[in-house]
């Protein structure tokens, strides 16, 4: 948009200069032709022509003096404007690259944080799984120990009961021996029979 406006302004100035120059050249020539046609017998008035050429040169110099500064300032202004535009474009490009780099770093950081959270969740899941298995192993070991303790306690209780019954049996047998006056062989047979009954019972 700016480039087209600049070209349009430049063309306008050049067109004006060309029109002025053409006008300055054509006017003296037409005047000379008209004057020569009217006085063909006298020939060309070179003095008059010289003054007209001098007027033309002065006029061209005047126009150059009036327009040169404007044309120069115009091109100088356009040069500064183009320089400013290029500088703004460069700064905008650097800002865009900086923003892109900043967003890329934020994206990489977010990706690493998400990966870290995923690893933490997976580690927690693994730790929870191992904790559950460890608790199950401990519970099974405790159950086994409790069962073993109950069995040992029952065996101990049964052994004590058998001893008490054996003592009672010996007392009864002794009483029977004293009452019946049986032989020792009979005593052993009676004890054996009683023990067999107790074993079958338990």
From Swiss-Prot:
<dbReference type="Pfam" id="PF00430">
    <property type="entry name" value="ATP-synt_B"/>
</dbReference>
<comment type="function">
    <text>F(1)F(0) ATP synthase produces ATP from ADP in the presence of a proton or sodium gradient. F-type ATPases consist of two structural domains, F(1) containing the extramembraneous catalytic core and F(0) containing the membrane proton channel, linked together by a central stalk and a peripheral stalk. During catalysis, ATP synthesis in the catalytic domain of F(1) is coupled via a rotary mechanism of the central stalk subunits to proton translocation.</text>
</comment>
<keyword id="KW-0812">Transmembrane</keyword>
<keyword id="KW-0375">Hydrogen ion transport</keyword>
<dbReference type="GO" id="GO:0045259">
    <property type="term" value="C:proton-transporting ATP synthase complex"/>
</dbReference>
<dbReference type="InterPro" id="IPR002146">
    <property type="entry name" value="ATP_synth_b/b'su_bac/chlpt"/>
</dbReference>
<keyword id="KW-0138">CF(0)</keyword>
<comment type="subunit">
    <text>F-type ATPases have 2 components, F(1) - the catalytic core - and F(0) - the membrane proton channel. F(1) has five subunits: alpha(3), beta(3), gamma(1), delta(1), epsilon(1). F(0) has three main subunits: a(1), b(2) and c(10-14). The alpha and beta chains form an alternating ring which encloses part of the gamma chain. F(1) is attached to F(0) by a central stalk formed by the gamma and epsilon chains, while a peripheral stalk is formed by the delta and b chains.</text>
</comment>
<dbReference type="InterPro" id="IPR050059">
    <property type="entry name" value="ATP_synthase_B_chain"/>
</dbReference>
<comment type="function">
    <text>Component of the F(0) channel, it forms part of the peripheral stalk, linking F(1) to F(0).</text>
</comment>
<dbReference type="GO" id="GO:0046961">
    <property type="term" value="F:proton-transporting ATPase activity, rotational mechanism"/>
</dbReference>
<dbReference type="GO" id="GO:0046933">
    <property type="term" value="F:proton-transporting ATP synthase activity, rotational mechanism"/>
</dbReference>
<keyword id="KW-0066">ATP synthesis</keyword>
<keyword id="KW-0406">Ion transport</keyword>
<keyword id="KW-0997">Cell inner membrane</keyword>
<dbReference type="GO" id="GO:0005886">
    <property type="term" value="C:plasma membrane"/>
</dbReference>
<keyword id="KW-0472">Membrane</keyword>
<keyword id="KW-1003">Cell membrane</keyword>
<dbReference type="InterPro" id="IPR005864">
    <property type="entry name" value="ATP_synth_F0_bsu_bac"/>
</dbReference>
<keyword id="KW-1133">Transmembrane helix</keyword>
<keyword id="KW-0813">Transport</keyword>
<protein>
    <recommendedName>
        <fullName>ATP synthase subunit b 1</fullName>
    </recommendedName>
</protein>
<comment type="similarity">
    <text>Belongs to the ATPase B chain family.</text>
</comment>
<feature type="transmembrane region" description="Helical">
    <location>
        <begin position="17"/>
        <end position="37"/>
    </location>
</feature>
């Amino acid at each position: 948009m700016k480039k087209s406006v600049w070209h349009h302004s430049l063309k306008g100035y050049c067109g004006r200069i060309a029109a002025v120059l053409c006008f300055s050249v054509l006017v003296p020539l037409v005047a000379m032709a008209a004057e020569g046609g009217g006085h063909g017998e006298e020939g060309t008035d070179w003095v008059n022509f010289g003054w007209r050429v001098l007027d033309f040169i002065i006029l061209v110099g005047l126009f150059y003096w009036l327009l040169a500064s404007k044309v120069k300032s115009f091109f100088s202004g356009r040069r500064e404007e183009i320089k400013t535009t290029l500088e703004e474009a460069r700064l905008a490009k650097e800002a865009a690259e900086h923003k892109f780099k900043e967003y890329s770093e934020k994206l990489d950081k977010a990706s690493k944080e998400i990966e870290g959270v995923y690893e933490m969740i997976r580690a927690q899941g693994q730790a929870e799984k191992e904790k559950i298995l460890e608790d199950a192993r401990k519970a099974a070991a405790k159950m086994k120990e409790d069962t073993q303790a109950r069995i040992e306690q029952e065996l101990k209780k049964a052994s004590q009961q058998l001893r008490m019954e054996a003592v009672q049996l010996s007392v009864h047998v002794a009483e029977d021996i004293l009452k019946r006056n049986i032989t020792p062989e009979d005593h052993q047979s009676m004890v054996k029979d009683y023990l067999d009954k107790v074993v079958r019972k338990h």
